[in-house]
């Protein structure tokens, strides 16, 4: 991924991961996985986006908060895209229920240097980060609840800047609940609604509260979505609205334009972007 030197907008949630720093050959997943009939175990390099915070509805939207809650992503420098870290992960499924758990190094990395690579394990300096999630699926509805615990605290000021270079050796956590449910469904078409909410127990962290509601229409070749988001940062409140449409052009090629309106203490922003997806 590459981008220009100047950012596109000054929104706080990050309207898209395209705003991430330039990366060349950053390692996302590398490790050993063992699978049983109802369980999986993974040991190696991994990031949180591989296993958490994604669903049929949220994966349509471009805003970064639909990929991971800002109460976590903005508050902790964890193995969240474009960073990864050493991980012990497992999941167990039974009768519509799934439990997932991952234990990570407290800070994620994406370099190839001695002191900047995803193979580092430094609990004394970086702390440890654990994330657990319980899921339930029933009649095409999906429901999630989880908690993330970090053994370090990364407090920021009202400008969103870290108060100290070294994190405090204090434990804090974030919790969330999320659900999506079809309202109408035929053999090829469906309309679903979704809602999610999250809080961070430490109000000195970058983001302490987040919520979103939205709806998605899908058929054999189209997916359209509308969502509204709210996030409480140290700098203030941010509100955003996203409209997006994904169109399947061929069996392997999709195009997806997107419009977002964002308002916060820094101003009002309107962003238009598009992504091209190729499956092979």
Q: What are these language model-derived features?
A:
Residues 35-38, 92-96, 136-140, 183-187, ...:
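Outer-membrane beta-barrel strand-turn architecture
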């Amino acid at each position: 991924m590459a981008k220009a030197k100047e950012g596109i907008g000054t929104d706080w949630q990050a309207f898209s991961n395209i705003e991430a720093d330039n990366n060349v050959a950053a390692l996302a997943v590398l490790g050993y996985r063992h699978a049983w009939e109802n369980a999986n175990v993974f040991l190696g390099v991994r990031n949180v986006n591989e296993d958490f915070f994604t669903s049929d509805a949220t994966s349509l939207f471009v805003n970064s908060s639909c990929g991971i809650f800002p109460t976590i992503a903005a508050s902790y420098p964890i193995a969240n895209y474009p960073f990864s870290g050493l991980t012990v992960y497992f999941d167990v499924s039974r009768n519509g229920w799934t439990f997932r758990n991952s234990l990570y190094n407290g800070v994620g990395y994406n370099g190839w240097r001695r002191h900047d690579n995803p193979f580092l394990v430094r609990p004394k300096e970086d702390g440890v980060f654990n994330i657990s999630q319980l899921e339930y699926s029933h009649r095409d509805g999906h429901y999630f609840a989880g908690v993330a615990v970090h053994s370090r605290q990364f407090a920021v000021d009202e400008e969103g800047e870290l108060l100290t270079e070294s994190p405090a050796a204090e434990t804090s956590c974030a919790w969330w609940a999320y659900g999506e449910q079809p309202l109408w469904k035929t053999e090829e078409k469906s309309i679903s609604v979704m809602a999610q909410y999250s809080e961070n127990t430490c109000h000195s962290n970058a983001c302490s509260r987040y919520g979103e509601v939205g709806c998605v229409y899908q058929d054999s070749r189209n997916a359209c979505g509308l969502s509204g988001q709210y996030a409480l940062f140290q700098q203030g409140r941010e509100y955003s609205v996203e409209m997006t449409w994904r169109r399947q052009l061929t069996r392997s090629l999709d195009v997806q334009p997107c419009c977002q309106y964002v308002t916060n203490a820094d101003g009002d922003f309107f962003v238009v972007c598009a992504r091209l997806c190729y499956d092979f």
